[in-house]
Amino acid sequence: EQVPGLFTTSRGIMGYGVSTGAAGGMSLRGIGGSPTAGLLVLIDGHPQYMGLMGHPIADAYQSMMAEKVEVLRGPASVLYGSNAMGGVINIVTRRQQEEGVKTNMQVGYGSYNTLQTEFSNRVKKGRFSSVVTGSYNRTDGHRPDMGFEQYGGYAKLGYDISSFWKVWGDVNVTHFNASNPGTIQVPLIDNDSRITRGMTSFALENHYEKTSGGLSFFYNWGRHKINDGYQI
């Protein structure tokens, strides 16, 4: 038998939340922290974390934008800084490699009025490529006052300058509303979050037979409105 090395906590059907009562905590080989300040999340090599608390916000990531997920287990602070004490998770975004157009759509509906919808369109024509994705997810939750709603979009444009050089830029925006009723023993009233997260990046890359390199710039931003039940 094998023991999993990566763990992620969940508090309900959908949505991890932030602040008091939040889930989405991740740990690699027992290291991660609560909140997850000891495990670094990257998107295409760019750090993703909330500036105030220093931890990633799991509800800000969209599955349709991801081509693959790379996991580096063990301390990696020499390369990635103090947030990578437990390891690194790198989300690699989609790229259209084959000539043509591909469109995908996923829709699911289940208990507690839970709805999941995702859409993606990928284009490759000559030297030009693009990826556009969108999603809308919601649920009433398995308890009263535990609703969650999320909608977001992602777009990437790329251009092959030559066989060895390419340039691309992308933007990702996600907004979600989450409610937390607290525990049955200690209920919370109006513990709501209204959070918008965004990122944009630009990169120039080269790939030769024996060498490769790149120059990239990125900018992350967010707006958070949180009523976490503190009493004065």
Where are these regions (language model features)?
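Extracytoplasmic beta-strand/coil segments of soluble accessory domains associated
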Residues: Q2-H46, E67
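Short beta-strands and strand-coil junctions in structured, solvent-facing domains, enriched
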Residues: M14-G15, T36, Q48-Y49, A76-L79, ...
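Hydrophobic, lipid-facing positions within transmembrane beta-strands of outer-membrane proteins
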Residues: G24, G87, V101-M105, L115-F119, ...
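Outer-envelope beta-barrel architecture signal
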Residues: A37-L39, E99-T103, L115-T117, G126-S130, ...
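Short strand-turn segments of transmembrane beta-barrel domains in outer membranes
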Residues: A76, V88, V92-V123, T133-G134, ...
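Flexible loop and strand-edge segments within Gram-negative outer membrane beta-barrel domains
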Residues: T139-M146, Q150, D160, F164-G214, ...
